[in-house]
Amino acid sequence: MSDTRKKEIIMATLELAANKGLGNVSMNMIADKVGIKKPSLYNHFKSKDELVEEMYQFLREEAKKNAHIGPIDYTSLFQGKTALDVLRLTVGGYFHMNQQEHMFNFYKVIYSERSLSPMAAKIVVEETEKMINATKQLFYAMQVHQLLHFNDPDMTALSFAMTVHGLMDYTFDQTNAGNEASNKLDDYLKWFCKENEVK
């Protein structure tokens, strides 16, 4: 399948899901939106679940490129920075990646359907696990470079990732409700660095 056709199918699916809800979108509707026959759609994707999973992977990679997120060289990332600088940079990058228009719209659909759709729940779990694993790698590197100290880096990474995830949702909800976003995320990062400083 050409990248152009793949993107066209993914964007059509995203638009339909945003308007009708993922559970209400059929392969037939997607084919009609793209202007192809339903059997042709099955030449590209075996099922709607496969299409949604592929959409997640595609949009995530697109968002990473747009947010300029690539492989991390911890030595250069840490050079001349405090622990707080590093956490602000990495959390800010993740936040920016998820605010990319297509990724943001995808998450709105997935989050609204995760209690009803096993596929949506699977994607939320997958993204959360990616966030936890990336945080573990970051914390091990920060400990090796003596930027922070953790008694249990794995549990600290889990706690940190879930707290940041929750605070990002909270910030989104504040903004969506028409309120000014608070500084709770930055306050948390400051507190976290103080609690885990190298002594």
Model-derived features with residue positions:
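Hydrophobic/aromatic residues within well-ordered alpha-helical segments
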Residues: R5, K48, M55, L59-A63, ...
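Amphipathic alpha-helical packing segments from all-alpha helical-bundle domains
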Residues: K64, D85, M97-Y111, P118-V144
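N-terminal positioning helix adjacent to the helix-turn-helix/winged-helix DNA-binding module
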Residues: T4-R5, I9-A12
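Hydrophobic alpha-helical connector segments
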Residues: E54, I69-Q100, T156-F160, S182
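Helix-turn-helix
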Residues: E8, L16-F58
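All-alpha amphipathic helical-bundle segments outside canonical DNA-binding/catalytic cores
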Residues: K122-T128, V144-A161
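Short helix-capping/turn signature of helix-turn-helix
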Residues: L22, F45, V109-L116
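C-terminal peripheral helix-coil segments that are non-catalytic and often amphipathic
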Residues: L89, G93, Q137-V144, M162-K199
